[in-house]
């Protein structure tokens, strides 16, 4: 348990200070907010602003799939970690760190959404819950994508583009939740996560375990 906590702490520092996930998500989203406010009418912003915010946040996260394991491989720390702890712990720590970073970034942008999109607190709460659920799945898929690119090493830049189609069902659910306040759809999102998460973890762990042919 102590090893896992240390791993999570290490990964959080890595993703926050080196990869700057939190800062990038906030800046990317602020750019989106400014562009949306300048280009669209107030009616369009109130109608489509939240759902476009979901897509914007996901795009900003998916872009990190190419560098998730980059520093670990380049400095040899991944090989060292594999000789000390299990690949499952490495993958779980990576997932938790990314998920925490994205959640913190989401919390930072909520006040901006509240001010610029003129939403009531209930809509903001539904937005947070639904996006938080999507971040659970997207964080695991980003780790999986990074594992694939780390394992094959060449001609894998396209892998990140396959993440978004897997998130489309949850994006649709989020749109319906925000439009109709249908909280029951959250349980469907939970079910989708429970299906994809174990598969994503198992595949990621397998790829990382065999990257140096360590058994």
UniProtKB/Swiss-Prot annotation:
Superkingdom, taxonomy of origin: Bacteria
Record's keyword annotation contains Ion transport: no
GO CC, one annotated term: plasma membrane
Main localization of the protein described in the UniProt heading: membrane
InterPro entries, alphabetized: Cyt_c_biogenesis_CcmB
Family: Belongs to the CcmB/CycW/HelB family.
Protein name in the entry: Uncharacterized protein RP268
Species, as recorded: Rickettsia prowazekii (strain Madrid E)
